[in-house]
């Protein structure tokens, strides 16, 4: 369908990166490669399938249950190469929107009145997280509005709400560092960086037989130092986090694919459908067979 039929907030890669407005880049394809691009503050995800992003030599495979939050100026490459189509969904904020949300959060009311437009750049590290959290839910609300071809005014308000959730996510990232009990700030930052390496490695292959030892090796940390630090930073043990992420991936696969329950069971690292169904039912209150399965995706543009 021709591009002129897409809403004005849905843009093309080559004319959307000036940071002058909020835009969404989305499309379904089996093969795509975009090398060496950088954006304003942005969020990368997938509506279905998976998209590979590479940043500074690191690989992030983004599924429909994950998102990648990138700071202003991070240079990346994008690749889709699959037998079945994947739909990427990328949100590019206008320059200053997220920074203004941050300014409003950390600045005293008196200073906001005296200098309401004194907005500074917001520095943060790229962040990979589950789409079932607050930021992901705000992103899903925007994606639903875009799919429904909502009015530009409605979508603009959703961008503002999403920007506020981005700031909350950045705050949580900083609190994760603060919660670590190392004395030196540089040590806390390094521990957090290594924990993030491990989480990204696990996200890349949830079906692998992860043990504490293999998780710790991915973080280049001693096993029990890794376990203690992970619990301090994220508020849950590595085992509990892995169990939650596997169930979240299963839920999204049930909602977005035609895979059988058995295929999904194996895809997230379970070897028994009975055990998988019991764990799923305990977490969500319904068996996998009770989840509404998807209709074929409707491509609007």
Language model regions located:
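Hydrophobic recognition helices of helix-based DNA-binding modules
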Residues: 101, 162-170, 230, 254
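Flexible coil/turn residues that form the inter-helical turn or adjacent wing/linker of helix-turn-helix
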Residues: 148, 208, 257-258, 269
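Basic/polar phosphate-binding segments, predominantly the helix-turn-helix DNA-binding elements
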Residues: 168-189, 197-248, 265-294
